[in-house]
Amino acid sequence: MLGIWTGLAVLALGGVIFLASRVWSLRGQRGTVLAAPDRTKTFNGPALTVGTYNIHRARGTDGRRDLRRIARVISGCDIVALQEVEGPRPGSGHNQAWHLGRWLRLAAHFAPSRKLFFFPHRGNALLCRFPVSYWQRLALFPSTGRAHRNLTVYQVDLAGSPVHILNTHLSKPAEGASPFEAVMSAFGQYPRAILLGDFNAPMDHPAMRRWLPPDTVDALADAGFDPMRVDMILIRGLSVDEAWSSPIGPSDHPFFAVRLRLQ
């Protein structure tokens, strides 16, 4: 009898380990505050600096993991959308966005897209200098393999008017075009919005063009960047003062930033 119970216990433990070791998608979530909101300030205009960066979990092209290098690249930005952000590591208790926010004195929000061993594993994040009154994380489907995706929408209060910041990291269109449709549909809901992220597709790809709101402006288009780039800053209801980038090195992606002005 003891042998039977031992066998059942081993099977149960094996089942738990199997389930925990699988990568699971996270459902949608919403909230009204970011971590460390005391770091935010009132927007006094007239312009703000916005960046997007796939940080590759802070692993550089030299193979070293160095989050401080990422912090140096993005310092000076008012709002930064990050992709491929790592969740809490064993013993640390904090995700990479939390550390970046602490070093740069910015409010931080980690939007995990998947969990591993029952804990948030990887996802996207936002660092913001201005108050955020609302955020919503939306799971995107279909997802393939371990690449679960999401879209997070933030309402940022600037000069008494809401500006919506959308951050995402999409799989290649060949793995499913529905996420592109969902992201562009959400982007089109807001008259003043900034869509940032890694789209794994250039601007002229049919999946980008098909659902893009007609009044969308590619904020990086006139800066002479590679037309095949997949990292985007798309805007509606704002104008571009200037755009710039930092090369790969701290990550396997370049960092892109723009200075925007409210219309």
Question: How does the language model describe each region?
Answer:
Residues 89-95:
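Short, flexible/disordered intra-domain loops and linkers
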Residues 1-75, 79, 91, 102-103, ...:
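Active-site regions of metal-assisted phosphoester/phosphodiester hydrolases
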Residues 81-86:
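A short beta-strand-loop structural module common to alpha/beta enzyme folds
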Residues 98:
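Active-site-proximal alpha/beta segments of enzymes that process anionic O-linked groups
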